[in-house]
Structures are given as structure tokens and as C-alpha cells.
Amino acid sequence: SQGSSAQSPCLAGSFQNQNRQASGIDADPGFYVSLNASPNQSACAPGEYQSSPGQSSCLLSDPGYFSSGTASSSQEVCQPGTYQPTPGQTSCLDTDPGYFAPNSGQSEQTAAPLDEYVPSSKSSSTEPCPDKTITISSAAISIDDCLLDSDGDRIHDGADQDDDGDGINDLQDSCPLGLTDWSSDANSDNDSDGCKDSDEDEDDD
């Protein structure tokens, strides 16, 4: 019988750079071959990777990951303090002040919760506000955003008409920053001056 004289082209995902070969060569990890009968494999571009041999295309890096160079066989994870929301990227983004990324592989930065702040970029944790202070919104960037809240009612003293929460308006309260955790009434504050009779008021009447 006669041998076949027909040549079969290498299929996509394989290549052959030598004559008279019986089969194609699978593309290496980090490379691809998109067309049939290709003499060469092509490297995956930055932002892409390919972990398997014999492939006809590369994969975009996932959100939370990146691929910085050519011919990458794997994607790299964003480290704590960084994030990446977009696929196919060559690097991660540093978190902004007021935000943090506590874990690896984050696709979003996280706003500092109430009563915490983040003063710098590329942060993986937050700082707590001092005792008896609050923030009025998330994503605080400075300890200056921590405002005094003497009575713990989540209204900072600058806007609170009753800083110690005793039921007496500060304008009429003789002890506006006095004891907290009590309310003015006939038994505790006989003269309604905002000073607790048993502990603060030397002139109950």
C-alpha cells in the first residue's frame, strides 16, 4: 500500500516549527496557539495567564488578582492593603485613606466602620476611636473625625443639646458635662438644675 502524502495541520493549541513531523507540539503553560497550522506559540500578555498546556487562548486575571508579566502560567493574588476590582490587570490598587483590605484577594476596598478610622493608604486594618468618641460617617481618615459623645447617645457633643443625657438642656444645665446614666426628676434633681443631688449638687434647692 502507498503511504499518505497529505499533511495534517496542527490544530489550535499546538504548533510545529520543524518540517516532516507527525504531530504538533502542545503550547506551554503561559503560552497559546490561536490558529491551526501555526509554526510558533505566543506568550500570554500582561494581565493574562494560562496554567494548562495546549491551549488556544489565555485567561484574564480575576478580580482580586493580577498578572504583571508576559508568559504567566498563574495569576498573582493581591496582598492585604491592596485590591483589584477589574479583571485582566497587571497590578493591584492600594487602598485609600479611610478604607482597608484585611484579606488577600480582595476585589473591593472596605470602608472603615463607624467609630474607627484609617489614616493612611495601603492599610489592612483600622484604628479605633478613643473612648467616648464617635464618627458620624464611615470611611473616617483621622482621629480628628472622632468626636466627643459624653453620654453615648450617638449625637456628638457639638450637636447634642443634652451632652450628659440627664434630660436637662445644656443651656439650663448647671452640670452640662456632669454624670451620665441618670435622668433628672424630682427625686434625683430637686431643683431641676441638671446636677444630680446625691453626687453633684451642693444646693439641692
Question: What is the meaning of each model-derived region?
Answer:
Residues S8, D26, Q79, D94-P97, ...:
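Extracellular calcium-associated, cysteine-rich motifs in secreted modular proteins
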Residues S1-S4, F15-Q21, Y32-P39, Y49-Q55, ...:
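Extracellular, cysteine-rich, disulfide-stabilized repeat modules with beta-strand cores
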